[in-house]
């Protein structure tokens, strides 16, 4: 709305704030903007596809690592006591402050973006999945053990299915 008001007053030069019809028209223009013959539309769509693929790869990596860490923290209280404070520290650090550090470590902007997306996904998935594992009542544990269930059966038949709603809540929180 502000762009229309500023554009209507004609106080800004066209090279600073072009009219809306010029912006839309340039998107559909068939003139090449690069040496390889790309138009604006192909450049925008190819860049969007690259960004989406990096975000999806980082989301999958963070999801898998968060789930594995939650499983390990539930299996061993020592792992939970060691890992949980670091999880809290990672969550407390601002991602914009962490981005230059990740970029300097990796040296590649593409892999840095994937790592940042994984970090953003990692914390909500791991903490929510751990909460899901811990939400199973003691009575259910005792019932499964009275039926002679092994630890593997305890996880596959009771704990993992019970934690799925928490896991998907973590995914929903971490997805933008």
Walk through the language-model features, giving the residues of each:
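Generic hydrophobic transmembrane alpha-helix motif, especially the helices
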Residues: 87-124, 131-132
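Transmembrane alpha-helices
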Residues: 115, 119, 152-176
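N-terminal signal-anchor/first transmembrane alpha helix
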Residues: 1-8
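Alpha-helical membrane-interface segments at transmembrane helix boundaries
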Residues: 45-53, 80, 87-90, 107, ...
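Transmembrane-helix boundary motif in ABC transporter permease subunits
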Residues: 57-87
């Amino acid at each position: 709305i502000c762009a229309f008001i500023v554009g209507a007053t004609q106080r800004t030069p066209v090279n600073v704030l072009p009219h809306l019809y010029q912006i839309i028209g340039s998107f559909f223009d068939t003139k090449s903007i690069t040496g390889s013959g790309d138009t604006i539309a192909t450049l925008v769509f190819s860049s969007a596809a690259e960004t989406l693929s990096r975000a999806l790869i980082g989301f999958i990596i963070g999801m898998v690592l968060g789930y594995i860490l939650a499983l390990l923290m539930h299996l061993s209280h020592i792992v939970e006591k060691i890992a949980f404070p670091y999880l809290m520290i990672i969550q407390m650090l601002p991602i914009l402050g962490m981005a230059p550090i990740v970029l300097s470590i990796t040296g590649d902007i593409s892999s840095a973006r994937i790592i940042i997306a994984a970090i953003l996904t990692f914390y909500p998935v791991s903490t929510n999945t751990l909460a899901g594992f811990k939400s199973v009542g003691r009575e259910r544990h005792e019932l499964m053990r009275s039926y002679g269930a092994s630890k593997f059966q305890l996880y596959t038949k009771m704990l993992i299915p019970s934690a799925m709603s928490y896991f998907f809540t973590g995914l929903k929180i971490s997805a933008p």
